[in-house]
């Protein structure tokens, strides 16, 4: 795994409710694009470059689209398979104090995937929690994903996919995972936005690298 100082803080919903008294970010990330990870040591670059390329592949994307067909059809209709999806894989690291309140993902996203990367089964109870929204507005817990090796989840993003994460406790050193987000990639505005975000993240990473050097 990369060193802590190779990561940078997350933003947006991924940091909601995750502040600590000392102000330290509780979720950090590494975008798994070659231009972003090029500052990693060569042995680590070789590993994460392959991981990023596989996760951005058409084969992986098509497999998720096939398995999530009911949810995608519910949102996009019968022609869901023709909706463009732009993959953005990131390596994330959460530390004690991290939490996320109940929310649904932004509709800029089409598919959300999280792949857990724990070293063992010692922290099974810190996986993502899924909720059901009842007619009275309450959102009780339906299930919780176990945070164990070779596991994770994926769902088609819609306005009923409520989920959260309980606070990561002091007994956990890091909560490592890969977030693979497929952003809806149709229409000129969405297409430009998706690529502009990648360019913007590249420049932020270069500035950060210059400050560290």
Range-by-range predicted roles:
Residues 1-67:
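Non-heme Fe(II)/2-oxoglutarate
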């Amino acid at each position: 795994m990369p060193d802590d100082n190779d990561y940078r803080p997350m933003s947006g919903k991924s940091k909601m409710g995750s502040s600590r008294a000392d102000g330290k970010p509780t979720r950090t990330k590494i975008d798994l694009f070659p231009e972003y990870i090029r500052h990693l040591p060569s042995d680590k670059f070789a590993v994460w470059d392959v991981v990023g390329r596989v996760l951005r592949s058409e084969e992986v994307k098509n497999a998720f689209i096939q398995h999530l067909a009911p949810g995608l059809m519910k949102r996009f209709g019968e022609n869901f398979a023709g909706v463009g999806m732009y993959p953005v894989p990131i390596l994330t690291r959460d530390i004690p104090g991290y939490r996320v309140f109940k929310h649904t993902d932004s509709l800029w996203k089409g598919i959300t995937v999280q792949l857990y990367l724990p070293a063992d089964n010692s922290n099974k109870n810190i996986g993502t929690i899924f909720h059901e929204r009842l007619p009275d507005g309450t959102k009780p817990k339906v299930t919780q994903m176990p945070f164990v090796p070779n596991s994770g989840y994926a769902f088609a993003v819609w306005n009923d996919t409520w989920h959260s994460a309980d606070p990561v406790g002091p007994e956990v050193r890091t909560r490592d995972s890969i977030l693979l987000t497929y952003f809806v990639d149709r229409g000129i505005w969405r297409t430009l936005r998706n690529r502009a975000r990648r360019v913007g993240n590249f420049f932020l990473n270069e500035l950060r690298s210059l400050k560290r050097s």
